[in-house]
Design a protein with these regions (language model features):
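Alpha-helix N-cap/helix-start motif at helix boundaries, enriched for small hydrophobics
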Residues: 47-51, 118
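Terminal transmembrane helical anchor/hairpin motif
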Residues: 3, 121, 128-250
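Hydrophobic/aromatic residues in alpha-helical transmembrane segments
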Residues: 19-23, 71, 113-115, 246-247
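Secretory targeting signals
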Residues: 3-8, 14, 56-131, 140, ...
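Transmembrane helix boundary and interhelical loop/hinge segments in multi-pass membrane proteins
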Residues: 20-40, 53-54
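Hydrophobic alpha-helical transmembrane segments of multi-pass membrane transport/permease proteins
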Residues: 1, 10-19, 136-137, 242
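Short cytosolic juxtamembrane segments of multi-pass membrane proteins
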Residues: 253-257
Length: 257
């Protein structure tokens, strides 16, 4: 319990403060300093530039986490000395300690990938930091927020219909083609209502189920009990890969424009 409480505080510090600070300059500063043009004309490919920035940030994160990983050893030595004085003994569960560290590292890599992508969308470091912080807070609290919303089928279908509209606008912002965006949105709305018509019973509490499935922190819970959740590990790696890919495509699009 002591270790989990300490790691909970470390998790909040890393995710809500350290990662936004680390990633806010990664791409936004290039635009602000107008050095992004050098990236576009560099003999090094955009893929390598983005991947290099991402891996550099992951390395910094890993160094910080490496220091934190000394805590279980220090704690064990501390409680051993206390036990020798006649107090109740306490043994650090290293499986829990380092399982949590591994899970937290992979989760942090995913958060860093998202942060780098958000940084590529703006030239303001402040806006990037705030946006990354808000996104990170949302991912930590989204299942709790979902519990506060109605779980009725009607609300669920209306919510996802509105979400599709927002995603269509986001797609238009990305590809600058309103007809393709409108078509994709229309097809998605049709699919949604067809699914609702035939499988309406599955829409009860659907939002909570979806958010639980994609929640970073919910998937991290197993690691805090010493369980190496392979599906969670693959999920974090997939999210990292996906957002690094999004960042590369974003930079390439700016280059061609």
């Amino acid at each position: 319990m002591l270790f989990r409480s300490v790691y909970g505080a470390i998790e909040i510090f890393f995710i809500l403060l350290l990662i936004p600070v680390l990633t806010m300059k990664s791409m936004a500063d290039e635009k602000h300093q107008k050095t992004d043009q050098l990236l576009y004309t560099s003999p090094i490919s955009i893929n390598k530039v983005v991947l290099g920035k991402y891996l550099a940030l992951v390395t910094l994160f890993a160094i910080g986490l490496l220091i934190v990983s000394l805590y279980p050893i220090i704690l064990q030595n501390l409680v051993r000395s206390v036990a020798e004085e006649g107090s109740t003994s306490y043994t650090v569960n290293y499986a829990v300690a380092y399982g949590s560290t591994l899970g937290f590292f992979l989760m942090g890599c995913a958060y860093i990938a998202i942060g780098v992508f958000v940084s590529s969308l703006t030239e303001s470091q402040v806006i990037a930091a705030v946006a990354i912080g808000v996104i990170n807070i949302f991912t930590m609290l989204m299942t709790s927020l979902a519990n506060m919303l109605p779980s009725s089928k009607i609300f669920m279908v209306c919510f996802f219909a509105a979400l599709i509209v927002l995603l269509a606008f986001a797609l238009n912002f990305w590809i600058h083609n309103k007809w393709v965006s409108a078509l994709v949105g229309l097809v998605a709305e049709i699919v949604l209502f067809v699914l609702y018509f035939f499988f309406s019973s599955h829409f009860d509490g659907l939002l909570y189920n979806v958010l639980s499935a994609i929640s970073f922190t919910d998937r991290y819970t197993n690691f805090t009990y010493g369980i190496l959740d392979v599906s969670a590990m693959l999920y974090y790696v997939s999210v990292s890969f996906l957002f690094v890919f999004f960042t590369i495509q974003r930079i390439k699009k700016q280059r061609y424009n």
